[in-house]
């Protein structure tokens, strides 16, 4: 239920930013600040989650969203009302999209645990392919499609969605693998393992803000290219270094900082490439690609 709510709120929050800031320069700064909220959570989440898991129970982590959600509700009540546009639902698109993502998610997670050769896993992956095809057909025929496929005619939109997917594959893949390594191989507690990621995650907010400044001076593509390059170098370093904890932690810094530099500018480029009334739709598409990327990363690296 919390995941469903987050999936609704995240694109809507970006649409609000797009609506509130018509000037591209101010909007870029606002998106960078928006990204800082997520990166601060990334920095504190592993530590807080580890502390709650060790001290109380893994169930306690789900209560972390309550104070944040209440604060957001209070602040949102003071924001200007958004213009409303009546849009019919797209039942066929919604059902086929949910079926495709659910089947894909279950298939890759279960396949990562039990093997991709099992009939149940193969059936889920086949269902995902069929549902994706049905979704594409439904969207081409719908009078009011949930995701107009014309968005993908824009090379900018396609590239931004692909980058979002790749970023989460790298980020969550690294977090997942090293979390297991720190705890199972090195015998660290959940709290200590969470602290190992602080050198990486603590710099993410600064990288988010730097992204907006670099983008305003050199154009938004500059921080994207620079961030992805720095991140790739960090990931290559992770592959090359030995299992010494100090070297692993040091290699995490460029891997994470580069992503923090690239992501806000990816969002800026995406929102600038589409009409304002499609901002929520495009943000939802980007968020979906990122979540699928994170899911696939965990499933693949779990093997």
Predicted regions and their residues:
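Hydrophobic transmembrane-helix bundles of small-molecule transporters
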Residues: 32, 54-164, 170, 188-189, ...
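12-transmembrane solute porter fold
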Residues: 13, 119-127, 131, 143-303
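ATP/adenylate-binding site constellation spanning eukaryotic-like Ser/Thr protein kinases
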Residues: 13, 45, 67, 100-101, ...
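Conserved protein kinase catalytic domain
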Residues: 1, 18, 62, 71-72, ...
């Amino acid at each position: 239920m919390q995941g469903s709510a987050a999936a609704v709120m995240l694109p809507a929050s970006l649409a609000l930013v797009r609506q509130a800031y018509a000037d591209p320069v101010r909007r870029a700064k606002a998106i960078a600040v928006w990204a800082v909220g997520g990166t601060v959570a990334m920095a504190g989440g592993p530590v807080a989650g580890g502390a709650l898991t060790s001290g109380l129970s893994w169930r306690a982590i789900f209560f972390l969203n309550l104070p944040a959600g209440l604060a957001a509700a209070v602040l949102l009540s003071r924001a200007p009302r958004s213009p409303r546009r009546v849009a019919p639902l797209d039942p066929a698109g919604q059902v086929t999209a949910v079926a495709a993502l659910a089947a894909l998610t279950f298939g890759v997670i279960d396949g990562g645990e039990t093997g991709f050769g099992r009939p149940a896993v193969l059936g889920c992956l086949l269902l995902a392919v069929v549902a994706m095809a049905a979704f594409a057909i439904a969207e081409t025929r719908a009078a009011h499609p949930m995701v107009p496929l014309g968005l993908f005619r824009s090379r900018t939109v396609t590239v931004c969605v692909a980058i979002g997917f790749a970023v989460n594959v790298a980020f969550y893949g690294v977090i997942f693998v090293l979390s297991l390594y720190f705890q199972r191989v090195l015998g660290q507690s959940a709290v200590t393992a969470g602290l190992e990621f602080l050198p990486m995650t603590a710099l993410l907010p600064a990288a988010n803000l730097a992204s907006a400044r670099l983008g305003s001076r050199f154009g938004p593509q500059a921080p994207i290219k620079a961030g992805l390059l720095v991140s790739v170098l960090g990931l290559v370093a992770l592959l090359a270094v030995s299992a010494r904890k100090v070297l692993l932690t040091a290699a995490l810094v460029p891997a994470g900082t580069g992503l923090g530099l690239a992501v806000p500018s990816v969002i800026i480029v995406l929102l600038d490439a589409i009409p304002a009334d499609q901002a929520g739709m495009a943000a939802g598409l980007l968020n979906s690609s990122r979540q699928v990327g994170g899911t696939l990363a965990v499933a693949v690296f779990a093997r």
